[in-house]
C-alpha cells in the first residue's frame, strides 16, 4: 500500500477543523470542503478535491438521514459523493450504517468506520461527559451537589457520567439491565436498580441522563416524573426516550447529539486525528 500523504476532510462540525489541523501538523497535505473555512486549504470544487485525495475523512456521525453528509455546506448527497470515489482511495467515516458503507464503496474504494476504533471511543468519553455537564449546567437552576440523578446505562459514557456526578456530590442511581453493571455501579458508590424497578424510583429524580440507544424511558416512567425533572438523552439513534410522550406529560426531554463537537471540539478533533493516524499505521498506510 502507498503511504497516505494527501487527505480531504469533508463536512461535519468544529471537530473536523481541529482534525484537519492535527493531520496537517502530522505532515500530511490536507484540504477541506464544506466546513465553512476561509483558508488556502479550503477547496472550492468538490470533484477536484476528491480526485486529489488519497484518503477522504467524513464526519462523526457521517450522516443523520442516510441521504446527506452531515454538516456539509452546501448539502452533499451521499450517492453523489460516492460516485466520485476512486478504487484506490481510502474512505473513513464515523458511525456508518451497513447501508451507507455499502453505498460509499460501490466504486470499489475501501471504506472504514473509524468510530469502531476502540482508542477513539475510549478517549471520546472525556469530551462527551464534559458536554453532558455543560448541557446540565445550562438547564438547571440548582446545584448538582445534593441533587438526585439517574443514569440509564453503565457502559463507558454512563459509568464516567455517574462517577463524575457522584464526585460532585449528587445522589446517583444507575439503572442498568445486567447484574454485573449494577454491581459495578454500587462499588463505584452509586445506588442501582434494573429497568423494571425504574417506575418505582422515577418520581424522586431531579434529572435523568440516558445513554441507552433503545426505548427505556417510555410513558410508564415519564408520567411519574415530577414536573421539574429534566431528561438529557445522549444515546445514539434510535435514542432511549419517547419524546412524544415526554411532550404530552410536560417533561423537558432534550436529545443531545454530537456533544464532543459542541463542548470540546479542539480536543475531540485531536482525538479523532490521533486515532485515525494509528489506524492507518496498523493498516499499513504509513
Q: What is the meaning of each model-derived region?
A:
Residues 8-18, 23, 145-165:
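Glycine-rich adenosine-cofactor-binding loop
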Amino acid at each position: 500500500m502507498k503511504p497516505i500523504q494527501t487527505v480531504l476532510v469533508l463536512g461535519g462540525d468544529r471537530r473536523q477543523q481541529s482534525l484537519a489541523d492535527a493531520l496537517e501538523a502530522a505532515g500530511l497535505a490536507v484540504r477541506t470542503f464544506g466546513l465553512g473555512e476561509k483558508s488556502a486549504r479550503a477547496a472550492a470544487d468538490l470533484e477536484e478535491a476528491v480526485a486529489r485525495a488519497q484518503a477522504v475523512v467524513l464526519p462523526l456521525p457521517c450522516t443523520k438521514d442516510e441521504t446527506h453528509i452531515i454538516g456539509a455546506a452546501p448539502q452533499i448527497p451521499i450517492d453523489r459523493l460516492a460516485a466520485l470515489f476512486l478504487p484506490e482511495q481510502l474512505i473513513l467515516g464515523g458511525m456508518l450504517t451497513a447501508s451507507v458503507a455499502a453505498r460509499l464503496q460501490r466504486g470499489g474504494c475501501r471504506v472504514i468506520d473509524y468510530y469502531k476504533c476502540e482508542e477513539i471511543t475510549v478517549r471520546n468519553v472525556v469530551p462527551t461527559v464534559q458536554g453532558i455537564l455543560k448541557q446540565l449546567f445550562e438547564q438547571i437552576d440548582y446545584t448538582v451537589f445534593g441533587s438526585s440523578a439517574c443514569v440509564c446505562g453503565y457502559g463507558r459514557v454512563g459509568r464516567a457520567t455517574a462517577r463524575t456526578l457522584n464526585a460532585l456530590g449528587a445522589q446517583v442511581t444507575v439503572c442498568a439491565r445486567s447484574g454485573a453493571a449494577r454491581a459495578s455501579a454500587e462499588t463505584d458508590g452509586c445506588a442501582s436498580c434494573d429497568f423494571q424497578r425504574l417506575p418505582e424510583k422515577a418520581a424522586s429524580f431531579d434529572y435523568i441522563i440516558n445513554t441507552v440507544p433503545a426505548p427505556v424511558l417510555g410513558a410508564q416512567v415519564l408520567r411519574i416524573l415530577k414536573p421539574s425533572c429534566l431528561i438529557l438523552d445522549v444515546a445514539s439513534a434510535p435514542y432511549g426516550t419517547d419524546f412524544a410522550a415526554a411532550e404530552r406529560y410536560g417533561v423537558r426531554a432534550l436529545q443531545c447529539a454530537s456533544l464532543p463537537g459542541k463542548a470540546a471540539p479542539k480536543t475531540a478533533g485531536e482525538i479523532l486525528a490521533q486515532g485515525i493516524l494509528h489506524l492507518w499505521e496498523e493498516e499499513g498506510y504509513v
